[in-house]
């Protein structure tokens, strides 16, 4: 696999550990939700998302009901766009207050910097909201890496397991699918990307997946333990 024209990467389990997201970010947002909803429910950036949650779930528009729904979604790792938007707003204060810094694997940091230096456009596609993605890379333990990226995509462009989402991303960045490499730890996402012609790499880190994965469709993708093994 030669140097691609563009690289699209996932975050959780790919550039960064699953444990940081599940053991630090998710619990932080869960704890903060009651106060956040009470204090910001009328804010113009917050109200549309709360309205969406209430309308889609038939939940009475009360603080308690909304918080309970959102906390349940956190517990079940829902990828709902409204939840991700609200989580991103909550994490803003956590990053700014120094309550935590984002984890990045050293091999990912090294390769991201090298690709940027080689003028390869880098993009993020994550279920987390675009503002949350930008916060993540701006407040990482490796420093502010947000400037390495040329663009950001979240589920407002479509679900990560839907091939049409990757078609939209390719059209947005103006590069044919065959010129893009997508890096992820989720096989279903890689299958969707491969379906429309993206080159795909399964990142199968031992820190996140102690037993190497040899599941259905694994062999459809380049299967590596880390960014250090990438051939470009």
Curated annotation (Swiss-Prot):
Q: Which UniProt keywords apply?
A: Amino-acid biosynthesis, Hydrolase, Magnesium, Metal-binding, Methionine biosynthesis
Which InterPro entries does its entry note? Answer: Enolase-ppase_E1 (IPR023943), HAD-like_sf (IPR036412), HAD-SF_hydro_IA (IPR006439), HAD_sf (IPR023214)
Q: How is the cofactor bound?
A: Binds 1 Mg(2+) ion per subunit.
Say if the entry is tagged with keyword Hydrolase: yes
Biological processes annotated in GO? L-methionine salvage from methylthioadenosine
Q: What is its EC number?
A: 3.1.3.77
* Self-association state and partner proteins as the record states: Monomer.
The pathway this protein participates in, as annotated, is: Amino-acid biosynthesis; L-methionine biosynthesis via salvage pathway; L-methionine from S-methyl-5-thio-alpha-D-ribose 1-phosphate: step 3/6; Amino-acid biosynthesis; L-methionine biosynthesis via salvage pathway; L-methionine from S-methyl-5-thio-alpha-D-ribose 1-phosphate: step 4/6
The family annotation for this protein states:
Belongs to the HAD-like hydrolase superfamily. MasA/MtnC family.
Annotated GO molecular function terms are: 2,3-diketo-5-methylthiopentyl-1-phosphate enolase activity; 2-hydroxy-3-keto-5-methylthiopentenyl-1-phosphate phosphatase activity; acireductone synthase activity; magnesium ion binding
Record's protein name: Enolase-phosphatase E1
Q: Which cofactor does it need?
A: Mg(2+)
Kindly state which reaction or reactions the protein catalyses.
5-methylsulfanyl-2,3-dioxopentyl phosphate + H2O = 1,2-dihydroxy-5-(methylsulfanyl)pent-1-en-3-one + phosphate
Q: Which gene encodes it?
A: mtnC
What domain of life?
Bacteria
Main function: Bifunctional enzyme that catalyzes the enolization of 2,3-diketo-5-methylthiopentyl-1-phosphate (DK-MTP-1-P) into the intermediate 2-hydroxy-3-keto-5-methylthiopentenyl-1-phosphate (HK-MTPenyl-1-P), which is then dephosphorylated to form the acireductone 1,2-dihydroxy-3-keto-5-methylthiopentene (DHK-MTPene).
The record's section on NCBIfam families has: enolase-ppase (TIGR01691), HAD-SF-IA-v1 (TIGR01549)
* Top-level class of the enzyme under EC nomenclature: hydrolase
